[in-house]
């Protein structure tokens, strides 16, 4: 659907409290639209939007939507949602979140960042670099940037940086000038009828929708992207630790929670020395993707390096929350949004490198029954890498329970040795008491998951022995 900006003055957002729709609403507000919205309950996102002028109600009874010029909804909104049904009855144009985003991006030189893992940090890091280089970008990413405390910005520059979502295939609405893919993994397969090859072909379609004179940036360390790269008709730039990557990461080392490495590239006679205030080889890859794009747009090199060095990260991405006070010392609390086995593996590796002598306690809240079922073996394998596992019940994210895909099913799949160092906590509110009992001074406690696990952070950090 094409938007006529002359008649679209009032947009209603269903599920406005979600990170994706709230970011879109913020951009619409800053572009002068009247924004109304609805959700089931208030949160930090709705509070931020209300301060910006959004009119929000906390129910879905269908009364608020009928005066809007168009309505935007996310994949979390079901077909029987009263507001969705009311909009259809009133013949109000309905756009998916990704469709509205793609319409906004058409006004700019657009950069879309896709991938199973790392796209939020990469798009956030890229947005920060463009701001630091005075390119005054507009951006919309899938997390709250720690420096600006917002997932979105409207600038006066030529560039629009956005996270591209494969979870509902809505990245196919986009036709970017530059497309980035960090990796491809077997996630969100329900969107693709359980067919990984269909997921892969959809990524190819997305990349082939890049502008004819555009650029595709791919991580060559990913075997699927390595397979895809020669098939594309667009100009391809590759990056990675791989020896044949055009932008190649070398001499990586981690010092505490900082990363140091060099990037060899065709554009430079000497390697680029990069410092990041973030741990993990996965973040070195994210920074290398940013460097490749910076070269495409001819960004000032000192500004690029400064932006990488001082990028403070994205909320819930290896975020240090504080210390939990124990009777005889403290334990450090870290929160991370990762909910796929490969993301958990990267988080644990970064934490091990930062604190090699300290015990790792992983508190994991599985996200979706379908993902738990599809990746059960992979979860069991990666969870065994922690010193102690505290397993919460699956966060449903709106799914109905699936037999054999809950927390107890995960434990039953574990080896006897792993099961003996696992504590199952069915109710999130019981977590502070459990951690007080099992934690030891100097423990690193990682709260891992994309559900509501973060809501317990305040209680943990303020818990006294």
Swiss-Prot record:
A molecular function GO annotation: ATP binding
Biological processes annotated in GO: cell division; cell wall organization; peptidoglycan biosynthetic process; regulation of cell shape
Binding site for ATP: 115-121
Entry's family note: Belongs to the MurCDEF family.
PANTHER family tied to this protein: UDP-N-ACETYLMURAMATE--L-ALANINE LIGASE, UDP-N-ACETYLMURAMATE--L-ALANINE LIGASE-RELATED
NCBIfam families: murC (TIGR01082)
Protein name: UDP-N-acetylmuramate--L-alanine ligase
Name of the encoding gene: murC
């Amino acid at each position: 659907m094409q938007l006529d900006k002359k008649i679209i003055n009032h947009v209603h957002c269903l599920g406005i409290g979600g990170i994706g729709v709230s970011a879109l609403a913020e951009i619409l507000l800053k572009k002068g639209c009247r924004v109304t919205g609805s959700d089931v309950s208030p949160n930090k996102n709705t509070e931020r939007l209300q301060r910006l002028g959004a009119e929000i109600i906390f129910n879905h009874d269908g009364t608020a939507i009928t005066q809007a010029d168009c309505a935007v909804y996310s994949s979390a909104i079901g077909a029987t949602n009263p507001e969705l049904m009311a909009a259809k009855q009133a013949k109000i144009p309905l756009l998916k979140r990704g469709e509205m985003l793609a319409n906004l991006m058409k006004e700019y030189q657009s950069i879309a960042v896709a991938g199973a893992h790392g796209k939020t940090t990469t798009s956030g890091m890229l947005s920060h670099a463009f701001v630091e280089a005075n390119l005054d970008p507009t951006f919309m990413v899938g997390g709250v940037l720690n420096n600006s405390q917002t997932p979105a910005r409207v600038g006066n520059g030529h560039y629009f940086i956005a996270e591209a979502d494969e979870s509902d295939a809505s990245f196919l609405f986009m036709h970017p000038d530059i497309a980035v893919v960090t990796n491809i993994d077997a996630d969100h397969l329900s969107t693709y009828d359980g067919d990984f090859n269909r997921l892969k072909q959809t990524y190819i379609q997305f990349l082939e929708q890049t502008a004819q004179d555009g650029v595709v940036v791919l991580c060559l360390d990913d075997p699927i992207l390595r397979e895809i790269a020669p098939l594309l008709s667009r100009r391809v730039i590759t990056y990675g630790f791989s020896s044949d990557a055009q932008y190649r990461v070398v001499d990586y080392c981690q010092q505490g929670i900082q990363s140091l490495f060099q990037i060899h590239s065709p554009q430079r006679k000497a390697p680029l020395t990069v410092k990041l205030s973030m741990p993990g080889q996965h973040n070195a890859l994210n920074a290398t993707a940013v460097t490749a794009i910076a070269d495409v747009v001819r960004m000032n090199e000192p500004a690029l390096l400064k932006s990488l060095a001082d990028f403070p990260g994205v909320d819930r991405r290896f975020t240090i929350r504080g210390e939990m006070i124990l009777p005889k010392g403290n334990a450090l609390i870290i929160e991370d949004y990762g909910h796929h086995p490969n993301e958990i593996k990267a988080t644990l590796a970064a934490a091990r490198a930062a604190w090699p002598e300290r015990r790792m306690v992983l508190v994991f809240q599985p996200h979706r029954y379908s993902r738990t079922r599809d990746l059960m073996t992979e979860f069991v394998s990666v969870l065994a890498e922690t010193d102690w596992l505290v397993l919460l019940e699956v966060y449903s994210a709106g799914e109905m329970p699936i037999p054999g895909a809950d927390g107890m099913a995960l434990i039953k799949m574990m080896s006897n040795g792993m099961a003996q160092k696992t504590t199952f906590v069915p109710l999130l509110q019981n977590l502070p008491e459990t951690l007080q009992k099992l934690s030891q001074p100097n423990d690193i406690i990682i709260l891992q998951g994309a559900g509501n696990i973060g809501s317990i952070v305040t209680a943990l950090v303020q818990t006294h022995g």
